[in-house]
């Protein structure tokens, strides 16, 4: 079955694994999924990223983070914003603050994929891929 939106697929896999308290989850590897995973790691939502497989069948293995004695997921929610049928672009001043700054937005800019905080610091806007909190 063809996957028409690999970013939504990645977010859904991470969300489902996080809800079920899995230690790791596998995501098909691409430049975009690597970039999103790297941003999630830099912001503290994922502890480790590794790759397995070769060529077309390469997967990213993401080690999820949990907090506290009862292992509460660090990722509470992931929401896709810009979709293949309706792209959402924002300039620097219009970049959203997710939950008043407690969450983050992942933005695809001309300087690469980055968090909303980094995009504001660098003064660039772009496509709002998703919200994470």
Curated annotation (Swiss-Prot):
The keyword RNA-binding applies. GO terms for biological process: translation. Transmembrane segments: none annotated. PROSITE patterns: RIBOSOMAL_S8. InterPro entries: Ribosomal_uS8, Ribosomal_uS8_CS, Ribosomal_uS8_sf. Belongs to the universal ribosomal protein uS8 family. PANTHER family: 40S RIBOSOMAL PROTEIN S15A. One of the primary rRNA binding proteins, it binds directly to 16S rRNA central domain where it helps coordinate assembly of the platform of the 30S subunit. This is Small ribosomal subunit protein uS8. The gene is rpsH.
């Amino acid at each position: 079955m063809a996957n028409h939106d690999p970013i939504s697929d990645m977010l859904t896999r991470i969300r489902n694994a996080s809800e079920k308290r899995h230690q790791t989850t596998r995501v098909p590897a691409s430049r975009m999924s690597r970039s999103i995973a790297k941003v999630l790691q830099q912001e503290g939502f994922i502890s480790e990223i590794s790759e397995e497989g070769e060529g077309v069948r390469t997967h990213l293995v993401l080690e999820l983070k949990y907090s506290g004695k009862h292992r509460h997921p660090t990722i509470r929610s992931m929401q896709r914003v810009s979709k293949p049928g309706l792209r959402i672009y924002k300039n620097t001043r219009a970049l959203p603050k997710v939950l008043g700054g407690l969450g983050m937005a992942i933005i695809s800019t001309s300087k690469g994929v980055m968090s909303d905080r980094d995009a504001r610091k660098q003064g660039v806007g772009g496509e709002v891929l998703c919200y994470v909190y």
